[in-house]
């Protein structure tokens, strides 16, 4: 799988721009748990996931994590290069949720091409708008949706991503995704278990009734 076949703007670049990217492109393999980008002090560049899974999250003043969005195969991330856009002051951390192969276009290289190419600039603005729309949707969920519905939604999302009803995940990890406390998540999961929705075991959650979880998240 070549970068040229995966980068959606490749055919919109001229020969010189393609050469600049090819000469500066970074190929990186990161293991699960690796922090790839850490706040505004980093200016990693534009990320394109070749294979794997990344998680973009923020930290509250109390040190709690909350997941903004995840990145899968062929997804691009611009917030890792937000330093090239002065109007954006958004401190995010990007972590590998699975072993991941990715490409990185250094921020200064991408910024230079964005100034030269209208298609690149337009695509960048559209992608950034999409990401901020995702974040705004998440904020609405946090403000207006009860925790039981958010936990149900998260469990269903995980079963879809992992393609299994047996999730190898800790209560702490769920809390980090949802911006909650581990103890609160544990109480909610125990309630789900008492209702026959899930089965809990050490480091694992088995979904027993996905239809009722779907109904719960829609209420």
Predicted region positions:
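Cyclic nucleotide-binding regulatory module and flanking cytosolic helices
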Residues: 1-31, 71, 76, 81-85
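Short phosphate-coordinating micro-motif centered on Lys-Gly-acidic
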Residues: 36-41
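Polybasic "coupling" helices that flank or enter modular domains
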Residues: 97, 115-180
């Amino acid at each position: 799988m070549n970068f040229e076949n995966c980068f959606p703007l490749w055919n919109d670049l001229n020969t010189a721009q393609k050469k600049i990217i090819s000469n500066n492109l970074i190929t990186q393999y990161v293991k699960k748990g690796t922090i790839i980008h850490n706040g505004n002090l980093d200016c990693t560049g534009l990320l394109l996931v070749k294979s794997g899974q990344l998680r973009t999250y923020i930290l509250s003043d109390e040190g709690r994590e909350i997941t903004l969005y995840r990145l899968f195969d062929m997804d691009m991330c611009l917030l890792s290069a937000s330093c090239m856009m002065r109007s954006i002051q958004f401190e995010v951390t990007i972590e590998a949720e699975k072993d991941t192969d990715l490409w990185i276009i250094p921020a200064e290289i991408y910024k230079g091409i964005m100034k030269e190419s209208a298609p690149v600039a337009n695509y960048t603005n559209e992608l950034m708008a999409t990401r901020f729309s995702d974040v705004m949707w998440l904020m609405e969920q946090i403000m207006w949706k009860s925790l039981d519905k958010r936990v149900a939604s998260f469990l269903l999302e995980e079963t879809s991503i992992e393609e299994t009803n047996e999730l190898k995940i800790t209560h702490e990890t769920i809390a980090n995704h949802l911006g909650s406390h581990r103890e609160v998540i544990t109480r909610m999961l125990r309630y789900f278990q008492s209702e026959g929705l899930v089965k809990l075991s050490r480091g694992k959650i088995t979904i027993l009734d996905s239809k009722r979880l779907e109904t719960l998240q829609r209420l």
